[in-house]
Amino acid sequence: MNMRPLNKILAGAILITCCWMNLANATLINRGNGMIYDSVQNITWLQNANLSGTKMNWEDSLAWADSLSVGSFDDWRLSNPDPICGLAVYNCTVNELGHLFYNEFGLTQGQGVSSLFSGTNANFNLFINVQASVYWSGAEYAPLTASAWYFNTKTGIQSAGNKQKGLYYGWAVRDGDVVAVPAFRSLAIFGLGLLGLAACKRQGRQRAKLGAV
């Protein structure tokens, strides 16, 4: 038996709503042009985790990220650490790279990204040239300003190294998304919800009339 027109509309509305909700709940999204959006942290990573092609000291790494222009955006920076986690610690997921390492890549303490090089981890495979090594963060280590924070993707540790003597990689990131979210999305979802509610009420009234006959 064919569905009634009202039921078809309701089914379509539910399907569209579910699709939009799934999109909104996505974590890592390939935006193209070498950029990956993290909807949980609301930041956009460079897809190429070694775009510079070389290790640098901290100041050169900062300058490199600041000079980048990718996808018409020029507000790139190095990732943020989390000083509250502390020095030489694992499982620091508030650290932006730590969140990517532990939450998105699903790695554990001491495991390292090299375990994913030839695997089928969908999140990890969105990126290229991820190094199993040390990446500078964009902040000084306050107790010793000759040092700066870093994150080691070989072990999953957050720590700090000498700004001048330490030669590590840089992985640029920027705040926010690189694609504007349609302003009508929320209104559309709300409207579809009202449509479903109206359909349910209408069917309820029809059943009540039939029961009264």
Feature map (PLM): residue ranges:
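An exposed tryptophan-centered "aromatic clamp" motif
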Residues: 62, 66-73, 81-150
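Short, structured beta-strand segments at or near domain termini in extracellular proteins/domains
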Residues: 162-180
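A short, hydrophobic C-terminal helix/tail in secreted or cell-surface proteins
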Residues: 182-201
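C-terminal membrane-anchoring or membrane-association module
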Residues: 198-213
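Bacterial N-terminal signal peptides that target proteins for export
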Residues: 2-11
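Sec/Tat signal peptide C-region and signal peptidase I cleavage site
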Residues: 20-26
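Extracellular adhesion/carbohydrate-recognition regions
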Residues: 27-77, 167-173
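Bacterial N-terminal signal peptides
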Residues: 11-19
